[in-house]
Amino acid sequence: MLTLIDPNDERQAFPPPDAALKEPNGLLAVGGSLSVARLERAYRRGIFPWYGEGDPILWWSPDPRLVLFPEKLRISRSLRKTLRRRLFRFSFDRAFRAVITACAERREKSEGTWLTADMQSAYLAFHHAGFAHSFEAWQDGALVGGLYGVAMGRIFYGESMFHRVTDASKAALAFAVGCLSHWGYRMIDCQVYSSHLVSLGASTIPRSEFQALVSEYSETSVDPEAWKHAPGDFL
């Protein structure tokens, strides 16, 4: 039975993740809002919103869960060659709005978008609150790839990525994983199975194991100053 989240009750707790439906896989709750407080409460439990235009807000905790441990990142020979050629320059938190807009445009062209205007506004507010972050790849001064997600505890919850030229999103991910690992993040959540992400080293784990890691990695936080270190500079 789905839990209905009252949009007027910011203190209402989410149900335990293991109460999620088996079909559709991981659907946990419906309703509520996309306020900063609500999003923070969700991500601290490993829960994320995902819904289409015209649908109510849906909250998910799928089983199994796709994750990428930084040390497991797999860089192909061709991508390694691309990185050695220095075709891209990288930054983080330099163009969050542009990254999320590009992610929405990509999905809209291919499969319809879940990144509605409300979702984009919510994550932009989450970014201003210091929780959501972006990584960017640039070429000749143009934004050609990137990704965004949510940093909570020692977990980075990846949300979406895009590319406009070959290998730009993969290169941005490699840069992001390097930064996140250096700063002390222990796990990158990739939500649901993707053959593309599996080829880069991601793997599925049972929800019970994922939730145990959420609890463990939420006990300590990465120094927020890490995200303030040269935040608009190219690296």
From Swiss-Prot:
Its main location: cytoplasm. InterPro entries: Acyl_CoA_acyltransferase, Leu/Phe-tRNA_Trfase, Leu/Phe-tRNA_Trfase_C, Leu/Phe-tRNA_Trfase_N. The keyword Acyltransferase applies. The keyword Plastid does not apply. Belongs to the L/F-transferase family. Pfam families: Leu_Phe_trans. Signal peptide: none annotated. Functions in the N-end rule pathway of protein degradation where it conjugates Leu, Phe and, less efficiently, Met from aminoacyl-tRNAs to the N-termini of proteins containing an N-terminal arginine or lysine. One of its GO terms (molecular function) is leucyl-tRNA--protein transferase activity. It comes from Methylococcus capsulatus (strain ATCC 33009 / NCIMB 11132 / Bath). This is Leucyl/phenylalanyl-tRNA--protein transferase.
